[in-house]
Curated annotation (Swiss-Prot):
One of its GO terms (biological process) is bicellular tight junction assembly. Glycans are attached at N108, N169, N213, N236. This is Endothelial cell-selective adhesion molecule. It comes from the Eukaryota. The chain crosses the membrane at residues 249-269. Highly expressed in endothelial cells. Residues 333-342 have a biased composition (Polar residues). It is linked to Neurodevelopmental disorder with intracranial hemorrhage, seizures, and spasticity: An autosomal recessive disease characterized by prenatal or neonatal onset of intracranial hemorrhage, ventriculomegaly and cerebral calcifications. Affected individuals have profound global developmental delay, intellectual disability, epilepsy, absent or severely delayed speech, and varying degrees of spasticity. Death in utero or in early childhood may occur. Residues 30-143 form the Ig-like V-type domain. It comes from Homo sapiens (Human). InterPro entries: ESAM (IPR042757), Ig-like_dom (IPR007110), Ig-like_dom_sf (IPR036179), Ig-like_fold (IPR013783), Ig_sub (IPR003599), Ig_sub2 (IPR003598), Ig_V-set (IPR013106). The gene is ESAM. One of its GO terms (molecular function) is cell-cell adhesion mediator activity. It is found in: Cell junction, Adherens junction; Cell junction, Tight junction; Cell membrane.
Length: 390
């Protein structure tokens, strides 16, 4: 066959058909075009024949030698009409996969379409104009039929949603990516024993099968069948029911344990830091005043009383004036024993003589010796010239 040259020729041929139809007188318009069906269905990938033929009123059914037919087939898709075949002056032109069933000239104008696709669905129009040898038109007619190309289901995909362990709920899903018309689904269990499922567990439109409260007896091979008017496709999934805890339960327990340990470690660390923060202010030493100097004093192994010494020191501090320099003439304190009588300090003389030194400690023990023996120094209050203690 000769391929169609383009839309320009299509328009010219259509104009020619209209012109020939206008030339035919009404009384001579005896041609009748026959299409037995208004709608046809075919399967994608196959072929279909669009039946069409014409008759002349008062003539035999077979074509006559004087008949000169002009035939054109059009396909309209998305508001655009396209010519798929034409037979004019003994020459046939067509698109790939399109042909006439019978050789021309013939009154049978049936059109064959091969290698069908879904996009070939739509209205097809057949137009015929018959002339005699003198070029006079014997009639013209045009009719249309609808072609619907069906698509069998594409192989579906089966999936298992959920964790199949005893007592759990799972869903088996099945989905076919392409079909025309829409498919319906059916789930069956093949092994170890055959079982067919129905609603409400089965959704025939969405292809889902809900299995609740799983048990070991529900394990097996499940087959999903996707079917429509022109075909069937299937897939399967194997369901194995676990009797132990599910993987999700184990994972949740592990994650919960790790989170608990992390929180416990955080609390311990926080408590430890708070304890250190409370200890640091307590250990700080604040120096408000300078401590008094401690004078060395002799020690005694048998005659020194520590309690009396501490009392003497306390009394001396209480009698000391809080402020001001020491008064003139005050005696310098010397270490002494609390168990012995203190000698009365002498008043300074007016003749300029130096005051007599304090008599040494009885017993012949020096102050250094007393210090080595563990004696505690005692502050002796000074006496003023008036005789009062300072």
């Amino acid at each position: 066959m000769i391929s169609l040259p383009g839309p320009l020729v299509t328009n010219l041929l259509r104009f020619l058909f209209l012109g020939l139809s206008a030339l035919a007188p009404p009384s001579r318009a005896q041609l009748q075009l026959h299409l037995p069906a208004n709608r046809l269905q075919a399967v994608e990938g196959g072929e279909v024949v669009l039946p069409a033929w014409y008759t002349l009123h008062g003539e035999v059914s077979s074509s006559q030698p004087w008949e000169v037919p002009f035939v054109m087939w059009f396909f309209k898709q998305k508001e655009k009409e396209d010519q798929v075949l034409s037979y004019i002056n003994g020459v046939t032109t067509s698109k790939p996969g399109v042909s006439l069933v019978y050789s021309m000239p013939s009154r049978n104008l049936s059109l064959r379409l091969e290698g069908l696709q879904e996009k070939d669905s739509g209205p097809y129009s057949c137009s015929v104009n018959v002339q005699d040898k003198q070029g006079k038109s014997r009639g013209h007619s045009i009719k249309t039929l609808e072609l619907n190309v069906l698509v069998p289901p594409a192989p579906p995909s089966c999936r298992l949603q959920g964790v199949p362990h005893v007592g759990a709920n799972v869903t088996l899903s099945c989905q076919s990516p392409r079909s025309k018309p829409a498919v319906q689904y059916q789930w069956d269990r093949q092994l170890p024993s055959f079982q067919t499922f129905f609603a409400p567990a089965l959704d025939v439109i969405r292809g889902s099968l809900s299995l609740t409260n799983l048990s070991s007896s529900m394990a097996g091979v499940y087959v999903c069948k996707a079917h429509n008017e022109v075909g069937t496709a299937q897939c399967n999934v194997t369901l194995e029911v676990s009797t132990g805890p599910g993987a999700a339960v184990v994972a949740g327990a592990v994650v919960g344990t790790l989170v608990g340990l992390g929180l416990l470690a955080g609390l311990v660390l926080l408590y430890h830091r708070r304890g250190k923060a409370l200890e640091e202010p307590a250990n700080d030493i604040k120096e408000d005043a300078i401590a008094p100097r401690t004078l060395p004093w002799p020690k005694s192994s048998d005659t020194i009383s520590k309690n009396g010494t501490l009392s003497s020191v306390t009394s001396a501090r209480a009698l000391r004036p809080p402020h001001g320099p020491p008064r003139p003439g005050a005696l310098t304190p010397t270490p002494s024993l609390s168990s012995q009588a203190l000698p009365s300090p002498r008043l300074p003389t007016t003749d300029g003589a130096h005051p007599q030194p304090i008599s040494p400690i009885p017993g012949g023990v020096s102050s250094s010796g007393l210090s080595r023996m563990g004696a505690v120094p005692v502050m002796v209050p000074a006496q003023s010239q008036a005789g009062s203690l300072v």
